[in-house]
Amino acid sequence: IPIVLLSGYCWLDPNLRSILGLAWDCGAVTTGPVTVPLVLSLGIGIANAAGKGDSSLSGFGVVTVASLFPILAVLCLAIFVSYTVSPEQIIAAASAGKALIASQATVETSVWDKTPLIEIVLGVRAILPLVLFLMFVLFIVLRSTLPNKMVTTYGLTLSILGMCIFNVGLTYGLGAIGAQTGSALPAAFMELPISQFSPIYPEAVGVVLVIGFAWLLGFGATLAEPALNALGLTVQSLTNGAFKKSMLMYSVAGGVSVGIALGVAKLVFTLDLMTMLLPLYLIGIAMTVVSTEEFVNVAWDSAGVTTGPVTVPLVLAMGLGLGNAASAVEGFGILALASICPIVAVLSMGLAIQLRQKM
């Protein structure tokens, strides 16, 4: 509720309205392949140890809370800055930053720009501090021991190596092709300087093709998310196979694909984000009230696991590229829509299962 109220306040302020897409997207990018498995394990472990909840899925819901607070923090920061800094100062600082970047473009690049060293450092930084903190809590605070030390060390080593390689692949592969594709997509329905054949199709056909591409991108990228696979396996294990992993993954992927398609439609038709986001959240809240705890916990956690290291680089790059090419006010907001739609999709699936059981 506080987030919705702050979003409404920002929406009514012309100077703050453009921050809404960024703020809601921040909630979608905070939970990734490192955070989600850890948070899921902690929530389930604490719930089982404390004996809280009547359901095996009562430990879910922590990922949702972890996704909401970044939105709240960005909105509060934006409101604070709006009261302490004038729009003219912000514009001047942005112009100075652009000039600095332009001047640095002519300077010889450093080793960080010529090699994937920064991606490797970020991969190590993503896991190593967290591992050290968990070791401190386990050994010093809880005075416990680590079973299967060799297996755990082997797994942690592979995790760090895998994250480093994954970061390099994202930077030089998915991120680059996502930005290029997003910049070229508007050529399907409008004239662009980068394409001599634009517009390639009539406007109506081109718009349908772009939105259809966004739908397929969302569906395929979501199925490839490691965090969603981890969530599906956890749910299937806790419910002894009653809640199939494939059933959850396909319903979540369908919701994300619809959300990304709506986000692209927002950019193409320059629609207002809050008029699309608020009704979906109201629908989600209404369905939450009438759904069972099992589906509510899983549904709201699915919002945090769908926007991970595969989806985010592609969608952000495509959204910003499409927004710049189509001269949209801002290219953010796609991830926010991609987060709420799977919640509605999983809750709808849960209500359908409940209705079928009653019949």
Description of each model-found segment:
Residues 1-5, 204-288:
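Helix-loop-helix junctions within the multi-pass membrane cores of secondary transporters/permeases
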Residues 2-8, 31-37, 65-74, 156-167, ...:
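Small-residue-rich segments of transmembrane alpha-helices in multi-pass membrane proteins
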Residues 7-21, 46-53, 76-88, 112-113, ...:
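Transmembrane helix-loop junctions in multi-pass membrane proteins
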